[in-house]
From Swiss-Prot:
This is Uncharacterized protein YfeN. InterPro entries: Channel_Tsx-like, Channel_Tsx-like_sf. Transmembrane segments: none annotated. Coiled coil: none annotated. Signal peptide: none annotated. Belongs to the nucleoside-specific channel-forming outer membrane porin (Tsx) (TC 1.B.10) family.
Length: 254
C-alpha cells in the first residue's frame, strides 16, 4: 500500500507546478436524489451474500476543467433514511469517487488517477472496499460528444483482501443532442477488470469482471436535470453472476 500511495503522492507533487499556473476552463456542481431499483432476479440471487436491496441515495457531484487537466468526483449517502447499523442491504452506506486526468502536453494523452471507496457497518460489522487506479488515458472530443478511454493498474484495500489486483480498462462517453426544443444527454461509463488476484477473484466471480451504467438525461432547465440509468455488473460487486438495476434521478444544478 505504501508503494502505491507514494506513486500517487509523487504524481500529485509533479503536477503542482502545472496546477499553480492553471487556467480554469469551466465546471459544474449538482446535488441529486436517486433511487436504485435492482431487478427481482438480482435481489433474490444476492440475498444470502451481498444483499442487493433497492435503495435511495443523496449525491453531491462536481467536475472542473483546467488548462492542465480535469477533475471529477461524487459523494453518495445511501439509505440516508435508515440506521447506520441496520441489517445488510438496508444499512446506511457512504461512497465516493474521484478521477483526475493530467494532460501530457497537447498529445491527447493524460495521466489517469482514480480513487473509489464504499463503507458500511451493517449489524455493527464494518465493511470497506477501496480501489485505486493509476495509468494512462486519452481524450477523444468533438462538437457535443466525448469518448475518454483509460488503461490502469489497480490496487485494492478491502475488508477481505488488500494488495495489487490486476488491471482495469474502461471509458466514459457522452453525447448531447436536441429533440425539438428539449436538451438531452446520453452517457456511458464502463470498466472491465482483468487479471485479478486469485484471493479477490474467489469472492467476486473470477479473474475478470464488468461494471458500468448507461444513462439518458433530460436537461429540463438550467437548474433541473432528470434521468434514468441502466446499471449493470457481471462477476463484480461480490457476486459471480450478472446484476442489473434501473436508477431514477433528479438533480439540481448550481
Amino acid at each position: 500500500m505504501k508503494k502505491h500511495l507514494l506513486t500517487l503522492t509523487l504524481s500529485s507533487i509533479l503536477a503542482i507546478p502545472v496546477v499553480s499556473h492553471a487556467e480554469f476552463k469551466g465546471g459544474f456542481a449538482d446535488i441529486g436524489v436517486h433511487y436504485l431499483d435492482w431487478t427481482s432476479r438480482t435481489t433474490e440471487k444476492s440475498s444470502t451474500k451481498s444483499h442487493k436491496d433497492d435503495f435511495g441515495y443523496l449525491e453531491f457531484e462536481g467536475g472542473a476543467n483546467f488548462s492542465w487537466g480535469e477533475m471529477y468526483g461524487f459523494f453518495d449517502w445511501e439509505n440516508f433514511y435508515n440506521g447506520r447499523h441496520n441489517k445488510p442491504g438496508s444499512e446506511q452506506r457512504y461512497t465516493f469517487k474521484n478521477t483526475n486526468r493530467i494532460y501530457l502536453g497537447d498529445t491527447g494523452f493524460n495521466l489517469y488517477l482514480h480513487a473509489y471507496g464504499t463503507y458500511g457497518s451493517a449489524n455493527r460489522v464494518n465493511f470497506h472496499d477501496d480501489m485505486f487506479l493509476y495509468g494512462i488515458g486519452y481524450n477523444f472530443t468533438g462538437s457535443g460528444w466525448w469518448f475518454k478511454p483509460f488503461f490502469a493498474k489497480r490496487y485494492t484495500d478491502q475488508t477481505y483482501y488488500t494488495g495489487d489486483n490486476g488491471y482495469v480498462a474502461g471509458w466514459v462517453a457522452g453525447y448531447n443532442f436536441m429533440l425539438g426544443s428539449e436538451k438531452f444527454t446520453l452517457t456511458n461509463w464502463n470498466e472491465y477488470e482483468f487479471d485479478r488476484d486469485a484471493t479477490y477473484a474467489a469472492g467476486n466471480g473470477g479473474k475478470e469482471g464488468l461494471n458500468g451504467a448507461v444513462a439518458l438525461w433530460w436537461n429540463a432547465t438550467s437548474h433541473i436535470t432528470t434521468g434514468i440509468q441502466y446499471r449493470y455488473a457481471d462477476d463484480k460487486l461480490g457476486e459471480d453472476f450478472y446484476q442489473d438495476a434501473i436508477i431514477y434521478s433528479i438533480k439540481f444544478n448550481f
